[in-house]
C-alpha cells in the first residue's frame, strides 16, 4: 500500500477507519480490498527463483521501523557468529532517518554485520554492476516493479524483511539459474 502513497509525502490514499486524521468523505471514488491472503499470494508469485545476487531494503527509502526490523533480523544471525559476505545486503534510507539510526546504533550494527547503508538514494536510481548483480531480492513490491521496468531492468523478487535478511546471510537459500527479463516479466531459463 505504501507504493500508492508515494508522492513527496502527500497522502494519495486513506484507509477508512485506519488512517489517522483522514478527511471526512461522503462518498468514495473506488474501493480496494487487499487482505492478508492477497499479500501471501503476491509473495508466493514473486518469491525468489534462482540465485539471488543482492538484497535491498527500502523503496524509495526504508523507514526507521523497516531499518530497525532489518537490524533485529541481522542481529539474530550475528549472535550465531554469522556475517554477510560481499555486502549482499543494502539498506536505503533518507539522510534524516540515517541520523536517527546512527544515533541508536542501528547503522553500526548493520555495517558490522557486513551490510551497506545508503542514504538519500533509492534502489531504482542506483547503478548496479551487472557483472555482479543480476537478480535482486527486496522487501518492497514497489521496488520490484521499478527495478524490473525502470532504469536498471533487473530481475527482482520480493519477500518479507526476515526472509530477505536470511538470503543475505545464506546465498544457498535460492540456487539455480538466475531469472532473466522477458519483456517486463522475469523468467528462469534452464
Model-found features: residue ranges?
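Anaerobic metallocofactor- and corrinoid-dependent redox/one-carbon enzyme cores
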Residues: 4-6, 108-190
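Intrinsically disordered, low-complexity segments enriched in small residues
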Residues: 1-90, 160-190
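Short acidic, glycine/serine/threonine-rich loops at helix termini
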Residues: 1, 24-28, 68-69, 101-105, ...
Amino acid at each position: 500500500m505504501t507504493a500508492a502513497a508515494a508522492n513527496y509525502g502527500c497522502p494519495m490514499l486513506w484507509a477508512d477507519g485506519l488512517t489517522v486524521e483522514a478527511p471526512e468523505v461522503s462518498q468514495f471514488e473506488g474501493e480496494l480490498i487487499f487482505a492478508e491472503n492477497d499479500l501471501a499470494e503476491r509473495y508466493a508469485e514473486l518469491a525468489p527463483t534462482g540465485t539471488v545476487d543482492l538484497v535491498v531494503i527500502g523503496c524509495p527509502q526504508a523507514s526507521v521501523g523497516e531499518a530497525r526490523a532489518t537490524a533485529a533480523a541481522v542481529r539474530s544471525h550475528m549472535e550465531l557468529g554469522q556475517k554477510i559476505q560481499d555486502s549482499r545486503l543494502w539498506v536505503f534510507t533518507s539522510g534524516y532517518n540515517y541520523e536517527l539510526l546512527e544515533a541508536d546504533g542501528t547503522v553500526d550494527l548493520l555495517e558490522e554485520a557486513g551490510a551497506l547503508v545508503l542514504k538519500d538514494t533509492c534502489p531504482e536510481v542506483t547503478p548496479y554492476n551487472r557483472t555482479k548483480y543480476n537478480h535482486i531480492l527486496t522487501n518492497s513490491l514497489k521496488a520490484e516493479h521499478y527495478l524490473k521496468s525502470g532504469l536498471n531492468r533487473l530481475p527482482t523478487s520480493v519477500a518479507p524483511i526476515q526472509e530477505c535478511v536470511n538470503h543475505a546471510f545464506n546465498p544457498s537459500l535460492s540456487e539455480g539459474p538466475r531469472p532473466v527479463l522477458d519483456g517486463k516479466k522475469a523468467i528462469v531459463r534452464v
